[in-house]
């Protein structure tokens, strides 16, 4: 199953993805995103200056305003 990086504060999302069989890893830093098929972030760490390092080629989903179920659906859509 796909490896999904999820920010540690999104515990409900982590649990929902685990229930669906995904390999969930906490995103505590840039290194944690390496090798992930998809990442889920809160959006609070968005780089305002637009300068960032690309460490994953997979999709990144911003969780703000979405339920855990909606995020799971987005992950599944992106990984198709």
From Swiss-Prot:
Q: Which source organism does the UniProt entry give?
A: Geobacillus kaustophilus (strain HTA426)
Q: HAMAP family in the record, alphabetically?
A: UPF0180
Record protein name field: UPF0180 protein GK1051
Domain of life of the native organism: Bacteria
Transmembrane annotation, as ranges: none
Which family, according to UniProt?
Answer: Belongs to the UPF0180 family.
């Amino acid at each position: 199953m796909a490896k999904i990086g999820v920010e540690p504060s999104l515990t409900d999302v982590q649990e929902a993805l685990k229930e669906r069989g995904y390999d969930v890893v906490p995103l505590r830093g840039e290194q944690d995103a390496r090798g992930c098929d998809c990442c889920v972030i809160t959006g609070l760490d968005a780089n305002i200056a637009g300068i960032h390092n690309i460490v994953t080629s997979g999709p990144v989903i911003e969780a703000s305003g979405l339920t855990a179920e909606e995020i799971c659906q987005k992950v599944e859509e992106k990984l198709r």
